[in-house]
C-alpha cells in the first residue's frame, strides 16, 4: 500500500464506489477506498435475501442519477456483480477488512489511522 494518496474514501458501499469512480473520471488517479467488511456493499450482502430485487427507484420515488455509474433494477446478485465489475474496470485501490479508527489533519494532508495501522 502506498503512503500518500490524492483521495481516501471511507466506506465500500455504492456511494463510496461511486465516489472513487467520479474522482478518477475527474483526473484524480491515486485513489484508495477503505471498507471494514470482507467485501464491498456489506449492507446489501448482509441484509438482502438471495434473489431479492434491488431497484433504482425506492418505492416508486424517482431519482435522477448524475454521474458515471450506470445503475439499473436487478437482484442482490446482479447488483453485487455490477459493483465487482466497476471496481475491477476502474482499478482504484481497495483495502477490505480495514476499519478506519480516526483521521487527523496534519499541515496540508490528513493521516488515516486504521485498526491494522
Predicted stretch roles:
Residues 36-37:
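Residues in the short beta-alpha loop(s) of Rossmann-like NAD(P)-binding domains
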Residues 45-116:
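N-terminal Rossmann-like dinucleotide/flavin-binding domain of flavoprotein oxidoreductases
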Residues 3-33:
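N-terminal Rossmann-like FAD-binding beta1-loop-alpha1 element of flavoenzymes
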Residues 41:
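Short alpha-helix immediately C-terminal to the canonical SAM-binding loop
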Amino acid at each position: 500500500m502506498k503512503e500518500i494518496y490524492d483521495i481516501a474514501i471511507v466506506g465500500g458501499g455504492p456511494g463510496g464506489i461511486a465516489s472513487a469512480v467520479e474522482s478518477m473520471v475527474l483526473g484524480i488517479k491515486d485513489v484508495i477506498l477503505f471498507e471494514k467488511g470482507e467485501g464491498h456493499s456489506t449492507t446489501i450482502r448482509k441484509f438482502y435475501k438471495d434473489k431479492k430485487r434491488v431497484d433504482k427507484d425506492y418505492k416508486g420515488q424517482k431519482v435522477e442519477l448524475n454521474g458515471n455509474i450506470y445503475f439499473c433494477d436487478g437482484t442482490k446478485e446482479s447488483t453485487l456483480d455490477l459493483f465487482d465489475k466497476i471496481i475491477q474496470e476502474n482499478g482504484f485501490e481497495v483495502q477490505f477488512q480495514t476499519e478506519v479508527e480516526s483521521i487527523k489533519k496534519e499541515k496540508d494532508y490528513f493521516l488515516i489511522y486504521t485498526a491494522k495501522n
